Regions:
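Solvent-exposed alpha-helices and their adjacent loops that cap or buttress functional pockets
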Residues: 33-34, 131-132, 138-141, 157-162, ...
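Glycine/serine-rich anion-binding loops at beta->alpha junctions
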Residues: 88-117, 135, 241-256
Length: 282
């Protein structure tokens, strides 16, 4: 038996990172939005042993991959017995981008296993499993538009954003998440903003108001020589209402209210940055 799931990327419309907690994590408040850029995850049961197949190079040991960790967590938490699971990944979401590709893949594996083993597990239970894998994984169980708090693993649904287009640009450089958090820990780096106005803008499906409220703590600590400013300027020159780093980077997105303008911008920027994508909220 097989089950295929879309593992969609996300962008952070807001990302406010607070001080480090005693457990080593940071307090986070983020309005997160799933977008129509996805990996394809196929899970097949009854293959004799657990294994991972991927059409892109996998940098870590197979057992350390989030998808295979998701397999182990699922069976450990449910008490079900694996009859051998093969996870096949077709990657399209860039890595080291702040778009949540690995976390979304892991969430897709959990959803597929729930279907294949007919376990009847609730979304809430899958979110708790996901929290054992990474802070972003719970968001991807349901996706849509959500408010993330805690270290990012506590998610609450928001009214869906049903307007606007995103042009997402991934430059050649990648940012290490651990290093970006370290930079935020330096004195004077943390700037906390309220996400309440963004929630109101999303609820109203007001793209101009959403663009006005885009903010990300990590934008203050990007490495010297980053392409961030150049990409943001290029997006604005092509009509973006607002631009922002997604997650801890290095992908940057521009928000447009018109599909044709967004499409033209994506085609133009792709000449300089090949990993440029047109997406909408889903």
């Amino acid at each position: 038996m097989k089950c295929t799931e879309k593992a969609c990327a996300k962008v952070n419309l807001t990302l406010c990172v607070g001080n480090k907690r005693q457990d080593g994590y940071h307090e986070v408040t983020s309005v997160m939005q799933r977008i129509s850029l996805w990996d394809t995850v196929t899970v097949q049961r009854g293959t004799g042993r657990d294994r991972l197949l991927c059409d892109a190079p996998v940098t870590e040991d197979e057992n350390d991959n989030l998808c295979m960790r998701a397999v182990r967590v699922f069976f450990a938490e449910t008490g079900l017995k694996s009859d051998g699971v093969t996870v096949t990944l077709e990657k399209r979401i860039p890595m080291q981008a702040g778009l949540g590709g690995g976390s979304s893949d892991a969430a897709a594996v959990l959803r597929a296993l729930r279907t294949l083993y007919d376990s009847g597990i609730s979304d809430g239970a899958l979110e708790r499993m996901g929290a054992k894998l990474g802070s972003d994984v719970p968001f991807f169980i349901r996706g849509g538009t959500q408010l993330a708090t805690g270290r990012g693993e506590v998610v609450s649904p928001l009214p869906p954003l049903a307007a606007g287009w995103f042009v997402v640009v991934k430059p050649a450089e990648g940012y290490a998440t651990v290093e970006m958090y370290r930079r935020l820990d330096e004195p004077g780096s943390v700037l906390v903003r309220n996400s309440r106005y963004m929630q109101d803008a999303v609820a109203a499906n007001n793209v101009h108001a959403v663009a006005a409220e885009l903010h990300n703590s990590f934008g203050r600590v990007v490495p010297k020589g980053s392409s961030l400013r150049i990409i943001k300027d290029a997006l604005r020159a092509r009509g973006a209402l607002g631009t922002l780093l997604s997650g801890s980077g290095s992908a940057v997105f521009g928000l447009f209210d018109d599909r044709e303008a967004a499409l033209a911008a994506a085609e133009a920027l792709r000449e300089t940055w090949p990993l440029t994508f047109l997406a909408q909220p889903v």
